[in-house]
Amino acid sequence: MPDPMDTRAAWLSTPNHAMVEMARDLGYGKFVLDIEHGLFDFDPTDKLIALIKAMGLEVYAKVLGPTAVPIQQALDMGCDGVIIPHIGNLAHARKVTATAKYPPLGVRSFAGSRTSGYGGADDQWYADENTRSKCFPMIESAAALADVEAIVALDTVDGLFLGPSDLSLSRGRGAYRESDADMADLERAAEAANAAGKPWIMPAWTENERQAASALGAAFMVVADEYGSIFNGLFQARH
């Protein structure tokens, strides 16, 4: 019987080693680092990624933005994949996701870092690294959703990360409420990934979201975030 924790991930907003250890002890095997909105400087981020990988766990970086340098830095540090925010239309997605893959697939620049054993690389290593490191553009804008079927078909794209809150804002609905329109947008993106045979991920903070994500075939879902976990613990302790 599949372990349900295989489809659960924890979300970090700071380089919190203790939370990684606690989550690991509770069965979490995947972590998303919210570098875009969180408090991550280079040195502690590098150490956190090294710790997570030394534990044999998976780590994905939601990078600062859709540009080459933050994407390459996260991959050079050893992340299993990058989650790229602020993706626009197909042309934009094609240009941005190319920075996550080495030639001939893309234009990623080489660094003799953790992923290459701090040394050089041969042709097979480049091919293997293109397979190992995953690229997940975010579908969180009206433009990205309009082109989602073409975006997920790109050779430089390994899957999708759905951003419900920003997608609802971009689509003119205001705050995300898990409305029928919200869920229809998420279903379209999920079905595009499923049809392409590629995984997709989403944050699923509520039981309704988790059930919907599971029914639609999410590869995994982010179900616990650092700030929310602390807040909820403090709130519950008042009573």
What is the predicted function of each stretch?
Residues 31-32, 83, 161, 201, ...:
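Conserved beta-strand positions in the central sheet of alpha/beta enzyme cores
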Residues 69, 81-155, 164-169:
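Conserved anion-binding
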Residues 21, 25, 61, 66-80, ...:
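Catalytic cores of alpha/beta
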Residues 67, 108-121, 133, 139-146, ...:
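C-terminal alpha-helical cap/extension of soluble enzyme domains
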Residues 48, 52, 90-106, 174, ...:
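C-terminal helical cap(s) of enzyme catalytic domains, especially alpha/beta-barrels
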Residues 1-13, 121-131, 187-195:
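N-terminal amphipathic alpha-helix/helix-capping segment at the start of soluble metabolic enzymes
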Residues 42-68, 72-76, 98-106, 127-131, ...:
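Alpha-helix-loop-beta-strand connector modules within alpha/beta enzyme cores
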Residues 1-59, 63-67, 98, 135, ...:
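Conserved N-terminal beta1-alpha1 strand-loop-helix module at the mouth
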